């Protein structure tokens, strides 16, 4: 997918204390006031428009990102040019900590995101003598591994219905950390994004949504889906 130009928009006047709704979930959530003030001085608060790239696969991994607003799409390009989406990042998620000196996947904005962007060197120097930050990093890495394992199961021998249901339940549970439990599952990503995440065609995903609605498990609403029978739906997702 082609990207628009890298942004030049910084969030003038942004202050974590008054503007960040996900500070408790973010990488800085365990810092005391003095450490947090120093940490914020390292940050650039940047706004990316729809489809703008935060970073691209194989670029030098010189920055890390704490997502504070919006949804980011994480993906790799296969040798034949096809796209495999490997995840969707939510507010509070931490991105860009590559195992080597280059990013191993790409990240772009779905509908506009705001991030705290840190140059990698100063960030690593800041956390190295702060055990609470190292523990926080470990928590993020553990969660990322769990999500990767969940996707491996999704790409396994499941029917299209089971894959779509499992995706919706997993996404609903992630949203619940931000918004609380609700029967309506907001879907800012399109059907093609869901298809590229599940290893299905967009036609199969669209037919599956229609079938789930016809079976009265969900109803399709403008911003996502509403689960009509949570017990049956969760059972299908767990199959």
Curated annotation (Swiss-Prot):
Keywords: Activator, DNA-binding, Transcription, Transcription regulation. SMART domains: cNMP (SM00100), HTH_CRP (SM00419). Pfam families: cNMP_binding, Crp. GO terms for cellular component: cytosol. Signal peptide: none annotated. The keyword DNA-binding applies. This is Transcriptional activatory protein AadR. Possesses 4 cysteines which may bind a metal ion (possibly iron). It comes from the Bacteria. The keyword Protein biosynthesis does not apply. Residues 158-231 form the HTH crp-type domain. Transcriptional activator of anaerobic gene expression. For aromatic acid degradation. Also required for the anaerobic degradation of benzoate. GO terms for molecular function: DNA binding; DNA-binding transcription factor activity. Disulfide bonds: none annotated. The gene is aadR. Residues 191-210 bind DNA.
């Amino acid at each position: 997918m082609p990207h628009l130009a890298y942004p030049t928009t910084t969030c003038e006047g942004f202050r974590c204390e008054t503007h960040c709704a996900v500070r408790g979930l973010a990488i800085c959530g365990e810092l005391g006031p003095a450490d947090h003030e120093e940490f914020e001085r390292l940050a650039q608060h940047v706004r990316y428009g729809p489809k703008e790239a935060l970073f691209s696969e194989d670029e030098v991994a010189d920055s890390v990102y704490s997502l504070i607003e919006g949804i980011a799409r994480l993906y790799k390009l296969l040798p034949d040019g096809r796209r495999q989406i490997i995840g969707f990042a939510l507010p509070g998620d931490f991105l860009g900590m590559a195992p080597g000196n280059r990013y191993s996947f790409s990240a772009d904005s779905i509908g506009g995101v705001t991030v705290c962007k840190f140059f990698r060197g100063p960030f690593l120097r800041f956390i190295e003598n702060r055990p609470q930050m190292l523990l926080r990093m470990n928590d993020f890495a553990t969660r990322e591994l769990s999500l990767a394992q969940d996707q491996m199961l999704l790409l396994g021998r499941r029917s299209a219905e089971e894959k779509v249901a499992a995706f919706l339940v997993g996404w609903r549970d992630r949203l619940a950390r931000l918004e609380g439990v609700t029967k309506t599952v907001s879907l800012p990503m399109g059907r093609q994004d869901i298809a590229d995440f599940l290893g299905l065609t967009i036609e199969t995903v669209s037919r599956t949504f229609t079938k789930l609605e016809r079976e009265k498990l969900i109803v399709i609403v403008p911003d996502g889906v509403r689960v009509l029978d949570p017990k049956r739906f969760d059972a299908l997702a767990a199959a």
